[in-house]
Structures are given as C-alpha cells and as structure tokens.
Curated annotation (Swiss-Prot):
Name of the featured protein: UvrABC system protein B
InterPro entries in alphabetical order: Helicase/UvrB_N (IPR006935), Helicase_ATP-bd (IPR014001), Helicase_C-like (IPR001650), P-loop_NTPase (IPR027417), UVR_dom (IPR001943), UVR_dom_sf (IPR036876), UvrB (IPR004807), UvrB_inter (IPR041471)
Protein keywords: ATP-binding, Cytoplasm, DNA damage, DNA excision, DNA repair, Excision nuclease, Nucleotide-binding, SOS response
Span(s) of short sequence motif Beta-hairpin: 95-118
Sequence ranges assigned to domain UVR in this UniProt record: 609-644
Natural source organism: Methanococcus maripaludis (strain DSM 14266 / JCM 13030 / NBRC 101832 / S2 / LL)
Helicase ATP-binding domain location: 29-411
Origin organism lineage: Archaea, Methanobacteriati, Methanobacteriota, Methanomada group, Methanococci
Gene that encodes the chain: uvrB
One Gene Ontology term from the biological process aspect of the record: SOS response
C-alpha cells in the first residue's frame, strides 16, 4: 500500500513543553513499536493536538483518534485537517440523527420498535473513512466511540470492490451488474452518492464515499476514458487511468453467504424455540420467518444487524468487525480526554447486553442478537499496541498501564494555571454577584458551576432579578444552540454563564476572568479532584483569571486539585522567569452566527420581554428580505417565549 508521507503544515513551531513531549512520545513509539502505551498529561491550552500532530508526522503511522462525544470529535477533525491538508483526515461518528433502539419493557408489556433517522452526509463520511484506510497509509480518522460498534467485514468490503481501468475489456452490462452487487442503485433521474445512471456508452457514478461524479466512457466493450466531474456544473476536473470502486454500503453480502446465513438462522430458531413458552415461541417464529422472507425478497429486513453473526459466519460470542479492523496492525490509537473516553468504552457492552436480554427472554429476538454488539473493553485492549492517552487529568487505568507519563505543563503562550481561592459557602451567591460586577467593569465574563440543573435554573433567575445578565446551559440544548449561547457570551450579550458538568472539557473562552465553583466540598463525580482540575482549567485562557471554590470544609478532592494546580503554576512561573516571558491572554476569533436560537428554556423569565422585542424586530427584517422560512422560525420562538411568561 503506497501513499504519500504525512506532512504537517502550521504557521508556528513547537514551544513550551511541546518539544520535550514530542521527543518523549516519539522515542517510546520507536523503542517499543508493538507495545507502546503512553499518557500525555497536558494542561488545558498547552496545545496537545499540535503535539500529537507532530508525533504523527514523525512516526508516519495511520492514526485513529477517539473522542468521547461528537462535538469534540468535530473540533479535532477540523484541527487535524488544518495541520495535514495534503493527507487524508476523516470523520467517523454515529450516522443517526435520531435513534430509538429496539427494546421491550416487561413490567408494562411494552415493545418498542427500532426507529432511526440516518444522516446521509455522515454515512458518506464513514464510507470515505473506511475506503481511505483500506487504500493508503497517510490517514487520520477522528472517531467517537461509534468506532467499537459492528461495521461489516473489511476484507469482504475490499474484495467485493472492483477496479475500473482505461483500456480494460469489459461489457457495459457487466459493470452495471458489478455495481448492483455492491449496493449501488441505478437512477437515471437523480444522481447522489451510492447511485449511477446510464446513457448510451456513458456511465455516471457517484461512489458512496465522495461527491464528485465518476464518468466512464465506453468504446464497444472497452473502457475508453475515465474522468471526474464537478456535480454542480458538470465541468471536467481531471482525467484518470483507473479507479477502485468500493461498495456503497459497509454491509455487503455475496449471494452464496446470504443462503448460508438463512440456513444458519433457521437452525438457531429450531434449537431455541423449545426453550420458550407457547406465546413467546409463536412470536419469535412468526417474526424470524417474516425477516427471512424479507431478506430473500429484498436483501434486507428491519433489524437485519441482529443476524450479523450468521451473515459474517462468526462463532457464538465472537466480536463483530468494527472500524479498528480496517486499520493495518501497526496503527496508532490516540484516546482524547481519556479520563472520560476509557470509562465510556468500558460501559458500552454492558448497556447493550442488558437491553437485548429482555428482547431475547421474551421472544422478540434470537440469542445471536447478543453478538451484534460493541466491543468489550478486554477485546478493545487487544488493538492497543500503540496508544497515547491524552488528558489534563488521566485516570487510574491510563496511569497504571502506561510505559511513561509525558507531562506538557508549559503553555506556548506563557499563561499560568489560574490562582485558586477557597471561600466560605455562606453568602456564595452574593459573592458571585460582586465578582460578576467587577468582571463586567473589566469587560470579562463569568462561569459558574452548580451541582444540579434545578439549582442552575434558580440561580440564573435570581441573578437576572439582581440585574446580572445570565444564561444557563443544560443537557437539552443541542450542539448548534450550545455553540450559539457560548458565542453570545463571548460577544458580551450576557456576562454570566451557569452550568453543571457542561463547563468542563471543550469549553475554552478566553474572555472568562472568573470561575466560581459552588458547593465545592460536596464529594462526588462533579466535585472529585479530576472534575475540579478540569473546571479550574476553564480559566486558563486568560492572563488575569481566578477561580474560587466555595466550600465549608477542605475535602481530599479540593486538597488534591489545589495542590496539583499550585504545582503546575509554580513550574510555569519558573519557566516564564527563566525565559523572560510575559503571559498573554489568548486571542481567539469569534465565529460567525451559526443558527438562530430556537430553544428558549435557558432564558430567565425576567429577560423574556426584552428578548421578544429583539426577536420581533429580527422577524420583520427577515420578512422584508423575503426570508420567510427564517421569519416563521422566529415567530414560533416568540410564541414559545410568550407561553413561558403567561
């Protein structure tokens, strides 16, 4: 598999702790090419992604970067794309816009059918990722934990593809047959990824994993020319000699395998039915035979993934193929925010199995449905030959299983970890109001973390009554609206943002001059030492920022968090003095508006009348500009707000 080398493009060079971190990580990867496990302990804002990009360039290994949610995966994907414009950087997350898994609730005798809405763009990006890693080595795939779920056999995916070559003797009808075999659909009217059309001696195909049209021109029974067209204007982009056509879907099954799978399903059904009572037995038999009929007639059925063990000829208990199987053996895994991602990977299998158990026990699924599952953590570990755990607060697993912990404490900007103060829990709200007033005078913002959603709402309402412009973030707000709220905070449309655990990873706002942690002495998940250090890190983008922990007593978590912050701050200060560096607040451009806010739950009641006035002006402006859809959307938002104050 020949491919270009990774070439890192950046306007800046490694600085601060980055040089030592890069050298340390590369050294272990070269010294232990088959068992390199390392932790990059990098403080917030130290440029951990840039460090990893440098490591990838130096070791030249195909790389899988795993993040614990789609938002972080998207951020990392965009950063790596900027660093490696000449190489393949791909994105692999769950392709469901909406997903309701199949389940059965025995207590209510309620069966819930699977309901899902697939995002075609993300499905295309997933196909692009797998076709890239099977074709070349200069590939970085940024993924969510979706990468440990079943994906189809990579060998079969590659084998069932075929090459189109200029000068090749082949009938047009044979090309069409091959395309249909690998899930391409003929449609002479509308051409989208995964479809093809035929006109005379010309075939236009859009591979499932790209946007450009591939035009194949025949001369009799020979391929005369192949070139790529821009689908927008049909202009010719470039001519090519050959093209390898991968399937349009990840799950492709040869006809012979389909027959064997059906026989295997029927055999399992016969063996399992005696274990069920009459009602459950009848239900399962009826459902399974209907599914088989659909597979024979159409090639698929609802919930076909539950029969994947039979189609892939796996033994009972064997894991399904997943994205990790598409990589070559020497690939590098980077686990971002590992203190969050590792526990998430650990928990996936158990959650899936408990849901399937009631479906199997009550005759809705065969026991082989258990084997349509994510990897167990023990199975995932087998892929971790070369792994870098990345976190400001690595967990016990990472620290216990690393050859070394490489620290990245010094920021390229010279910024120090913020000063941390402990203040009494009494009058914490009044103290926050005073601090917010000080920050407003300085043109800076405030972040407050509470322990519950209700407390966040009540505090936001109270702050609004005290003339503090405040909003809160909650788990019901989707990614785009969350981005918009953060954008408005940065623009100064309000001064104080209240949240729960949403204020930890991935919220980097340079304008924040004060972070207040309420009830810091309540030991638990949101107030353990790792969570406190992550929250303190939200203030590490501003040279003058400070953090206050409101506590009635000094817990072990507070002691550890404060001690670690002071240790880092001391090292950073010494480095700055030695190299005559003055810390500079990060200057980060504010992105253009993404979308109008349609979720109104985060707006305090006291602020609603003013928001309505602003929105009405925006609605009339949109209507005058003939943007009727936008005007309707704003009108609906105003209606929601008016209901809230009735």
């Amino acid at each position: 598999m020949s491919s270009p080398d990774f070439k890192l493009k950046a306007e800046f060079k490694p600085k601060g702790s980055q040089l030592e971190a890069i050298a340390g990580l590369v050294k272990d990867l070269e010294k232990n090419p088959e068992k390199s496990k390392q932790t990059l302990l990098g403080v917030t804002g130290s440029g951990k992604t840039f460090t990893i990009a440098n490591v990838i360039e130096k070791v030249q290994k195909p790389t899988l970067v795993i993040a614990h949610n789609k938002t972080l995966a998207a951020q990392l994907y965009n950063e790596f794309k900027e660093f490696f414009p000449e190489n393949r950087v791909e994105y692999f997350v769950s392709y469901y816009d909406y997903y309701q898994p199949e389940s059965y609730i025995p207590q209510k005798d309620q069966y819930i059918e699977k309901d899902a809405q697939i995002n075609p763009k993300i499905e295309q990006m997933r196909l692009r990722a797998t076709s890239a890693i099977l074709s070349r080595r200069d590939v970085i795939i940024v993924a969510s934990v979706s990468c440990i779920y079943g994906l189809g056999n990579p060998e079969l995916f590659k084998e069932m593809g075929f090459e189109l070559k200029v000068g090749e003797k082949i009938k047009r009808s044979d090309i069409i047959e091959k395309l249909v075999d690998i899930q391409y659909e003929r449609n002479d009217m509308e051409l989208v990824p995964g479809r093809f059309r035929v006109k005379g001696d010309t075939l236009d195909i859009i591979p499932g994993y790209q946007d450009d049209i591939l035009r194949v021109e025949m001369f009799g029974d020979e391929i005369d020319r192949i070139y790529e067209l821009d689908p927008k204007n049909m202009s010719k982009k470039h001519e090519i000699d050959s093209f390898y056509m991968y399937p349009a879907k990840h799950f492709v099954i040869p006809e012979e395998d389909k027959k064997n799978a059906i026989n295997s399903i029927l055999k399992e059904l016969d063996e399992w039915l005696p274990n069920l009572d009459m009602l459950k037995s009848h239900r399962l038999k009826q459902k399974t035979l209907y599914d088989i009929e659909m597979i024979e007639e159409t090639g698929s059925c609802k919930g076909i993934e539950n029969y994947s063990r039979h189609f892939e000829n796996r033994k009972e208990g064997e894991p399904a193929y997943c994205l990790l199987d598409y990589f070559p053996e020497d690939f590098l895994i980077v686990i971002d925010e590992s203190h969050q991602t590792i526990p998430q990977i650990r928990g996936m299998y158990k959650g899936d199995r408990s849901r399937k158990q009631s479906l199997i026990d009550y005759g809705f699924r065969l026991p082989s449905a258990y084997d349509n599952r994510p990897l167990k953590f023990e199975e995932f570990k087998k892929y971790m030959n070369n792994v870098i755990f990345v976190s400001a607060t690595p967990g016990e697993y990472e620290l216990d299983n690393s050859n070394q912990v490489v620290e990245q404490i010094i920021r390229p900007t010279g910024l120090l970890d913020p000063e941390v103060e402990i203040r009494p829990i009494e009058n914490q709200v009044e103290d926050i109001i005073k601090e917010t007033e000080k920050m407003v005078e300085k043109g800076e913002r405030v972040l407050i973390t509470t322990l519950t959603k209700r407390l966040a709402e009540e505090l936001t309402e109270y702050l609004a009554k005290r003339n503090v412009k405040a909003r809160y973030l909650h788990s019901d707000i989707d990614t785009i609206e969350r981005t918009e709220i953060i954008r408005n905070l940065r623009l100064g449309k309000f001064d104080c943002l209240v949240g729960i655990n949403l204020l930890r990873e991935g919220l980097d706002i340079p304008e924040v001059g004060f972070v207040g942690i309420l009830d810091a002495d309540k030991e638990g998940f949101l107030r353990n030492d790792k969570s406190l250090i992550q929250t303190i890190g939200r203030a590490a983008r501003n040279a003058n920022s400070k953090v206050v922990l409101y506590a009635g007593k000094m817990t072990d978590s507070i002691k550890k968090a404060v001690s670690e912050t002071e240790r880092r701050r001391k090292l950073q200060k010494e480095h700055n003095e030695k190299h005559n560096i003055t810390p500079q607040t990060i200057v980060k451009p504010i992105r253009e508006k993404v979308v109008d806010i349609s979720d109104v739950k985060h707006i305090p009641v006291a602020d609603i009348p003013n928001v309505i006035v602003e929105l009405e002006a925006e609605m009339y402006e949109a209507a005058e500009a003939l943007e009727f859809e936008k005007a309707i959307k704003i009108r609906d938002t105003i209606a929601k707000l008016k209901k809230k104050i009735k």
